[in-house]
């Protein structure tokens, strides 16, 4: 054991709780949306994709981590490490890029930067495909030699190798690529879209350009997506910050808990995203009941 055995027991219990809540609530989101035709809107397609990404994290990542925490180290070998790292990374990236597509959808619908443009089912499907392409573009390279997945923190889960400059893996270039393309760029797009969106909502309210009912509906949807983005940032920024610090200070002495805490804090979006969706979407709640 790298740390007190009680820490592994606590980690296993935490992962069990995430699975116990995360699987049913994401599966319920998928089932209810597919079961009720009126929920099959372009916006909800993207939210469905978010649930699929969360299920990848729950089934491919959380279950593995719970099992290995019971043994005190990663017992599943190189193949298991690659699979766990791949599914956890893919799920997280699909969720992030789904939030990017949601932000763009909100910007187009509310701000109307393109006159007479309507966000349709085809556009939503293109957004879904884009999120998967970007997710795979981040999760696949470590499987084929550009960086690698290694056990991290308390050695019960696997992630991208921020820690070493292992010869032949080009870890430095991949980490820089990942931080720029798969973190800074999507966050910049999200902040731009919501900055414009908030301005447009205030201007519309002041000018009374749309009916009160339409304004209220757009505000509710926008509020739901903004809360999802804030929640995502609260969970992922600590992990990204610690990972970048480790990358920039390789060779520094830090304990296994230092990376473990932000890593497992970052797994909570798999639970709260569908909870936000259910709590703030009246139509979905009615269909669920």
UniProtKB/Swiss-Prot annotation:
GO annotation, cellular component aspect: membrane; photoreceptor disc membrane; plasma membrane
GO biological process: absorption of visible light; G protein-coupled opsin signaling pathway; visual perception
Matches recorded under Pfam families: 7tm_1
Cytoplasmic topological intervals: 33-44, 105-123, 196-223, 280-289
PTM notes: Phosphorylated on some or all of the serine and threonine residues present in the C-terminal region. Contains one covalently linked retinal chromophore.
Glycosylation sites: 171
Family of the protein in this entry: Belongs to the G-protein coupled receptor 1 family. Opsin subfamily.
Protein name (Swiss-Prot/TrEMBL): Rhodopsin
Species of provenance: Cottinella boulengeri
Organism taxonomic ancestry: Eukaryota, Metazoa, Chordata, Craniata, Vertebrata
């Amino acid at each position: 054991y790298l740390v007190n055995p009680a820490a592994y027991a606590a980690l296993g219990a935490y992962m069990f709780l995430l699975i116990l809540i995360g699987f049913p609530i994401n599966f319920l989101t998928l089932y209810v949306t597919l079961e009720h035709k009126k929920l099959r809107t372009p916006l909800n397609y993207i939210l469905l994709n978010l649930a699929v990404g969360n299920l990848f994290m729950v089934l491919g990542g959380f279950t593995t981590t719970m099992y290995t925490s019971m043994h005190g180290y990663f017992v599943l070998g190189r193949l298991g490490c690659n699979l766990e790292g791949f599914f956890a990374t893919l799920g997280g990236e699909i969720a992030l890029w789904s939030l990017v597509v949601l932000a763009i959808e909100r910007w187009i619908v509310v701000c109307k930067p393109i006159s007479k443009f309507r966000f349709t089912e085809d556009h939503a499907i293109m957004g879904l495909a884009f999120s998967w392409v970007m997710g795979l573009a981040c999760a696949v390279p470590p499987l084929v030699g550009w960086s690698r997945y290694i056990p991290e923190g308390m050695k019960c889960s696997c992630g991208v190798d921020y820690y070493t400059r292992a010869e032949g893996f080009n870890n430095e270039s991949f980490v820089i690529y990942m931080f720029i393309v798969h973190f800074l760029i999507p966050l910049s797009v999200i902040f731009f879209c919501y900055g414009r969106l908030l301005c447009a909502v205030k201007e519309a309210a002041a000018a009374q350009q749309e009916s009160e009912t339409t304004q209220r509906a757009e505000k509710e949807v926008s509020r739901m997506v903004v809360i999802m983005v804030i929640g995502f940032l609260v969970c992922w920024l600590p992990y990204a910050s610690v990972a970048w610090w480790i990358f920039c200070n390789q060779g520094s002495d830090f304990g296994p808990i230092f990376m473990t805490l932000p890593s497992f804090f970052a797994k909570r979006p798999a639970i709260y995203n569908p909870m936000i969706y259910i709590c703030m979407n009246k139509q979905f709640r009615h269909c669920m009941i």
